[in-house]
């Protein structure tokens, strides 16, 4: 059995988990998420804890049990606490502004870059050089943050660009004559 799947997922108060034949639905204060259930994994709910077991002894079923456990755990944490990614803009004149579900970036191009946030994702700018992406779906939050960063990734000589707040950019040494 997968080591990840051995630990059950605790369901906190205020979170409702329903398991149908092929769908797992999680509802909480942060929203509602659903995940397709894999046929190789048996999910059981006992006393507020979800346990995951492979249906057979195949390697694929063993791997999927750990994957399903982590996906459901991310859903439970997402609807109860939520996920967030923090990005910072480094460079002279680099600015970000959020209005509603739109993000406008002025990052040294001849034109402004605009992003439309998908449903369930909120974006805020605490300062003009910081972007905060929040949501219940961990994958969607990470994907949106990666798409924003990909517009202008940090360059290796001065470090200018959009980076994650905890990212360390290795600065290269310039060419010497």
UniProtKB/Swiss-Prot annotation:
Keywords: Ribonucleoprotein, Ribosomal protein, RNA-binding, rRNA-binding. SUPFAM superfamilies: Ribosomal protein L6 (SSF56053). GO terms for cellular component: cytosolic large ribosomal subunit. InterPro entries: Ribosomal_uL6-like, Ribosomal_uL6-like_a/b-dom_sf, Ribosomal_uL6_a/b-dom, Ribosomal_uL6_bac-type, Ribosomal_uL6_CS. One of its GO terms (molecular function) is structural constituent of ribosome. Pfam families: Ribosomal_L6. GO terms for biological process: cytoplasmic translation. This protein binds to the 23S rRNA, and is important in its secondary structure. It is located near the subunit interface in the base of the L7/L12 stalk, and near the tRNA binding site of the peptidyltransferase center. Part of the 50S ribosomal subunit. Belongs to the universal ribosomal protein uL6 family. This is Large ribosomal subunit protein uL6.
